[in-house]
Amino acid sequence: CPLKFIRLTYMDLTDRMLEILKADKTVVVLLSTHHRNGVGSQRAAMHKLLMAGCDVPVVLHRDFRETDVELLQLKSAADFGTLLLDGFGDGLMLHNEGCEAVVSDRCMFGILQATRTRISKTEYISCPSCGRTLYDLQTTIARIKEATSHLKGLKIGIMGCIVNGPGEMADADYGYVGAGRCLLYTSPSPRD
């Protein structure tokens, strides 16, 4: 059976609608909101679905009107990330009138990566650099990214000094730390 997508808001989740959702296993809810407190509205809707025993897939949907990409990233990460970290939502749908779809796509993949919902790229951890850094950190980061960006799912730490580096990249799969000469570390055991 093909899937049926139905766009709903918190106010649409009446007792009758909840019964319909429970009975039809081909429905995917596109949970939208235009409420001033959109996160609260979508969280309340998710709780209502849970309390009613509706085990339907839910795609969190938000509309934005941002021309500044960084502002879009901040707002959408705050709105979607909060819910995903709480375990709500099975997918994201971001619509923004102020930018191209590819920007929205990158933004959504970044949110999914940051919340560990879906890993789709290499993750990098780096320090901002300080007086203890004994090499050109920015150039090194660029070179490492160029050589490793295809390694989906890896976490790579790139630190400027041996003082804080190992601790700050403790959960990385690989680490690159400068100490006059650079030391390469690997995690002691495989990560999930």
Where are these regions (language model features)?
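Long, compositionally biased, glycine/small-hydrophobic-enriched stretches that function as flexible linkers
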Residues: 1-10, 26
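Flexible, charged surface loops at secondary-structure boundaries
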Residues: 2, 21-25, 169-170
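Conserved small/polar residues in nucleotide/adenosyl-binding loops
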Residues: 185-192
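Active-site-adjacent loop and "lid" segments of alpha/beta metabolic enzymes
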Residues: 60-86, 154-181
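Catalytic alpha/beta core domains of metabolic enzymes, predominantly
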Residues: 12-149
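Glycine-rich nucleotide phosphate-binding loop and flanking beta-alpha elements
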Residues: 100, 182-183
